[in-house]
């Protein structure tokens, strides 16, 4: 078995849109959070990279791990608001992040390693912290999947491109579990 490290893909172009205050309150309720919790750090908004995700930042990684989501209610909220899922993250004291990805609309209550979701969080981070991002890559490290017993480390690299938008690269380690060819 071999392990490959590195950036696996560059996120495609992205679009952002706001989330109504009513939907934010609903998401707080469905995540079993106190009202106002989702806006403590930054106002949540949607990032669309193909999948359209609501992005929420909590004050710390432990808050993210302690979430007790109501998946049926999240499913209904996402369906009603054309969301693929909800990405929730928080920073630890060591500068790494905890990320949880809820996508019940697609039959995945919680994804242990969601690259497009982590990339969407990278967009959210860059737009909320423009002074940190330059033409050199800023790096974020996300822990994901702990609650599911499937620990993953996802790396997100962000840089400001010449056109004023952010280039987001997502990757991490992977194990080749099977190899071969397929004929179509």
Swiss-Prot record:
Its main location: cytoplasm. Gene3D superfamilies: Diaminopimelate Epimerase, Chain A, domain 1. It is found in: Cytoplasm; Nucleus. Pfam families: PhzC-PhzF. Transmembrane segments: none annotated. GO terms for molecular function: isomerase activity. InterPro entries: Phenazine_PhzF-like (IPR003719). The keyword Iron does not apply. It is an enzyme of class 5 (isomerase). Keywords: Cytoplasm, Isomerase, Nucleus. One of its GO terms (biological process) is biosynthetic process. One of its GO terms (cellular component) is cytosol. Its EC number is 5.1.-.-. Sequence homology predicts an N-terminally extended version of this protein. However, this extension introduces 2 frameshifts, making it unlikely that this gene is correctly translated or that there are errors in the genomic sequence. Belongs to the PhzF family. This is Uncharacterized isomerase C186.06.
């Amino acid at each position: 078995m071999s392990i490959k490290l590195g950036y696996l893909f560059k996120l495609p172009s992205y679009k952002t849109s706001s989330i109504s205050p009513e939907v934010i309150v609903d998401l707080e309720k469905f995540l079993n959070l106190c009202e106002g919790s989702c806006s403590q750090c930054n106002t949540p908004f949607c990032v669309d990279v193909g999948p359209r995700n609501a992005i929420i930042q909590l004050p710390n990684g432990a808050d993210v791990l302690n979430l007790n989501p109501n998946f049926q209610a999240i499913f209904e909220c996402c369906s009603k608001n054309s969301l693929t899922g909800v990405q929730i993250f928080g920073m630890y004291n060591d500068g790494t992040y905890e990320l949880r990805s809820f996508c019940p609309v697609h039959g995945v209550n919680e994804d242990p390693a969601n690259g497009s979701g982590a990339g969407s969080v990278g967009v959210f981070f860059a737009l909320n912290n423009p002074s940190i991002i330059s033409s050199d890559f800023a790096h974020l490290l996300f822990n994901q999947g702990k609650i599911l017993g499937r620990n993953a480390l996802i790396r997100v690299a962000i840089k400001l491109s010449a056109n004023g938008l952010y280039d987001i690269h997502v990757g991490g380690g992977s194990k080749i579990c099977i190899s071969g060819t397929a004929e179509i």
